[in-house]
A protein has these predicted regions:
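Periplasmic binding protein-like
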Residues: 48-49, 382-438, 445, 474
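N-terminal lobe/hinge region of extracytoplasmic solute-binding protein
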Residues: 50-99, 129, 192-194
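Gly/Pro-rich hinge or "lid" segments in bacterial periplasmic/extracellular proteins
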Residues: 86, 170-222, 226, 344, ...
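Surface-exposed binding/hinge segments that line
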Residues: 96, 140-181
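Ligand-site clamp/hinge motif
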Residues: 185, 215-260
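Append "and occasionally in soluble cytosolic enzymes with long acidic Gly/Pro-rich linkers
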Residues: 292-381, 385, 449-451, 477
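Extracytoplasmic/peripheral linker and loop segments enriched in polar/acidic and small residues
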Residues: 389-400, 431-501, 524
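Long beta-strand-rich cores associated with HINT superfamily self-processing modules
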Residues: 498-524
C-alpha cells in the first residue's frame, strides 16, 4: 500500500514530536492476521516477542539481528561471534589458518543432530555450496569468495580459497550446518540442527515457533525447557504484554517504550552499543539520465535531512548519526564525514542541477528499525521543505520487499534499510554493500544495484590483506571513496536495547542484538 505525506503543512518540530509519539496520520495499522500473545508463560517456558516475523529458522535469506538468537538455538555453525566480537568455536574445536589461502578445521567429537545423526564433513561441504547457490542470499554477500572443502579425515578438513580471506573464521559463523541430504539452495522451513533446541511446532507464516530442549544435546544443557517465539509487530502490544507477564523478552524497542518500562517492578532493560547501520539508501539501478544517478543530486538531498532533530526528537537519543559508511565500532572502520543540515543549500543545489521538481518514492519494511515509520514521515516533511515531493511505500514483514531490493519488484528511489555487522569487521560489511560486480548485478545481488568497479577492487584488495594494519589502511581509502559517491541520503547507528522480565536471567546481550539461549535461565 502506498502512503503519501499529509497535505496540510506542519512545522518540522511539530511533525518530529508527533512522529515520536506515534500519532502521525501515516502510521499503518498492525496486521490483523498477527495475533498478540495470549496467557502467561509457564514456569519452564521462555516466551520471546519479536518485532519482525521470523519466516524461517534457516538464515540463507533471513538474518535480521534478533533472529540470530532463535536460529542458533536450532542450527549452529562451525564458529560463533561471542563477547568482544571475537570468534569462538562451536561445532569445530580447531579452526586455524595454516597457509594464506588454507584453514585447517576439525569437528568436535561426538556432535550430533537432534535426531541422532552425526555431523559429517560432507554436511559442511554441502552447506557451503547451498549458501552459494541460493538466489538473493544475504550471507553470500559477506564473503569475498566462498571456500572449497577438502576432507582430510572423518572429522577433519581444509577450507581453501583462491586468495587469502583472513577473517574466514568469523565469516563461517554465518553458515549454519544441516544434514547434507536435507539441505537445499533455499530457505529451509523445516529440518533438524545441532543446537540445544528442536522445533516441536511451527507456523512460519505467522512467525510463531515452539522449541523444546534436546534431551541429549552434545553441549551444555540449557536451563530453560521450552522457548516460545511470537511475532508481535506493534510495539505498544509488546510493551503491554511484557508488563502483564505474557511475554518474557521483547527486542528492538524505542526509548519511549524503554522510559515507560524503566523502574517498573518485574521488568529490566538490557542495553549495549550496536554494530548495525540504518540507512536511507539510494537506488543505484536508475537510468543514467535520472537525477539520482548524479552524485551531486544525491549529495544535495542529504542537506535536506535534519539528522540531529531525528536523533533527538524521533529516535530520542537511542542512536547516533553515522560519521562513516559503516559503524565506527567495527574493526577497520574509518570516520569519513558528517551529514550536514542546510535546507537552503539543498534548494540551491537542486535548482542548479535541474532537479528542483524531483519526486521520490521511499520504501521500507515495517520493523526495519525502531520508530521506522516516524522517521520516514519526518523525512518526507523535510524533503517537502526543499521542494521534493515524496510517496512512502511500507511493506509488512513477510512480503516481497526482497524482489524490490533486487530490482525485480518495481521502481523506487530510496530504501530504509538496516544492515548488521555480524563479524565485528568493517571489511565484511563493506564487502556486502559496496563490492558488488556487474556479474552480481545480473542476478540482482549487487546491494541496491551499487556497482563501482574501482571501489570493488579497493575493497577486494583490502579483504585479502593478511596484515591487519595494512588492511585497515586500504579499507580507510575505500571508505572515503564510498562516501564520495553519496550512497545514502542519511544514516544512523542505533543502540541495542531490549526489555525482559526479571525472572529471566543470563541474557548476555551482544552488539549484534542477539544472545546465547543456552545461558538463559528462569528464576522463581
Amino acid at each position: 500500500m502506498t502512503r503519501t505525506p499529509p497535505s496540510e503543512t506542519l512545522s518540522r518540530r511539530t511533525l518530529l514530536r508527533w512522529g515520536a509519539a506515534g500519532g502521525t496520520g501515516l502510521a499503518l495499522s498492525p496486521l490483523a492476521a498477527c495475533a498478540g500473545p495470549t496467557g502467561a508463560p509457564g514456569p519452564g517456558t521462555l516466551t520471546l516477542g519479536l518485532n519482525r516475523s521470523l519466516v524461517s529458522l534457516d538464515n540463507k535469506l533471513n538474518q535480521f539481528d534478533a533472529a540470530v538468537t532463535v536460529q542458533r538455538a536450532v542450527r549452529q555453525a562451525l564458529t560463533a561471534i561471542g563477547p568482544g566480537m571475537k570468534p569462538t568455536p562451536v561445532l569445530a574445536d580447531r579452526f586455524e589458518m595454516t597457509a594464506p589461502t588454507t584453514w585447517s578445521v576439525r569437528l568436535r567429537e561426538g556432535i550430533r543432530y537432534s535426531d541422532g545423526r552425526p555431523v559429517t564433513v560432507e554436511d559442511v561441504a554441502t552447506a557451503v555450496r547451498m549458501y552459494g547457490e541460493v538466489a538473493g542470499s544475504f550471507i553470500l554477500g559477506l564473503f569475498p569468495e566462498l571456500p572449497s572443502v577438502e576432507a582430510t579425515g572423518e572429522r577433519t578438513f581444509r577450507l581453501h580459497t583462491r586468495k587469502p580471506v583472513p577473517v574466514l573464521d568469523r565469516l563461517m559463523a554465518n553458515v549454519l550446518i544441516t544434514p547434507a541430504k536435507d539441505n537445499r539452495p533455499e530457505e529451509l522451513r523445516s529440518g533438524v540442527g545441532t543446537g540445544p533446541y528442536r522445533v516441536v511446532s511451527a507456523n512460519s507464516g505467522a512467525g510463531e515457533y515452539t522449541l523444546a530442549r534436546v534431551p541429549d544435546y552434545w553441549g551444555r544443557r540449557p536451563p530453560v525447557e521450552r522457548v516460545r517465539v511470537l511475532f508481535v509487530p506493534e510495539e505498544s502490544s509488546r510493551v503491554v504484554a511484557l508488563r502483564s507477564g505474557e511475554l518474557d523478552v521483547i527486542d528492538t524497542i524505542t526509548p519511549d517504550s524503554a522510559e515507560q518500562l524503566t523502574g517498573l517492578p518485574g521488568v529490566h532493560l538490557e542495553k549495549t552499543s550496536g554494530v548495525r547501520i540504518c540507512q536511507l539508501f539510494y537506488n543505484f539501478r536508475k537510468p543514467k539520465t535520472h537525477p539520482l544517478s548524479d552524485p551531486r543530486v544525491r549529495q544535495a538531498l542529504t542537506y535536506a535531512i535534519d539528522g540531529e532533530s531525528l536523533v533527538r526528537d524521533v529516535l530520542t537519543d537511542s542512536a547516533e548519526q553515522a560519521e562513516g559508511v559503516v559503524p565506527l565500532s567495527l574493526q577497520g572502520a574509518e570516520r569519513t564525514g558528517r551529514f550536514v543540515h542546510d535546507p537552503g543549500r539543498a534548494r540551491q543545489l537542486l535548482k542548479s542541477l535541474g532537479a528542483d521538481d524531483l519526486k521520490i518514492r521511499i520504501m521500507w519494511e515495517s520493523g526495519e528499525f525502531a520508530a521506522d515509520t516516524s522517521v520516514m514521515e519526518a523525512v518526507a516533511e523535510m524533503l517537502k521543505d526543499v521542494g521534493v515531493r515524496t510517496s512512502l511505500l511500507q511493506f509488512e514483514p513477510g512480503g516481497d520487499i526482497l524482489k524490490w531490493r533486487q530490482g525485480k519488484g518495481g521502481d523506487w528511489d530510496v530504501i530504509g534499510n538496516g544492515f548488521p555487522g555480524p563479524t565485528g569487521q568493517a571489511v565484511t560489511m563493506l564487502q556486502a554493500m559496496y563490492a558488488g560486480t556487474a556479474e552480481d548485478e545480473r542476478t540482482g545481488d549487487a546491494f541496491m544495484g551499487y556497482v563501482n568497479p574501482a571501489i570493488a577492487r579497493q575493497i577486494s584488495d583490502a579483504a585479502t590483506e593478511t596484515d591487519t594494519a595494512a588492511r585497515d589502511r586500504k579499507l580507510a581509502a575505500a571508505q572515503h571513496a564510498v562516501w564520495d559517491t553519496w550512497p545514502c541520503m542519511w544514516a544512523f547507528v542505533p543502540k541495542t536495547l531490549l526489555a525482559r522480565r526479571t525472572r529471566v536471567e543470563g541474557i548476555g546481550l551482544l552488539p549484534v542484538n542477539s544472545y546465547d539461549l543456552t545461558a538463559v535461565r528462569l528464576e522463581g
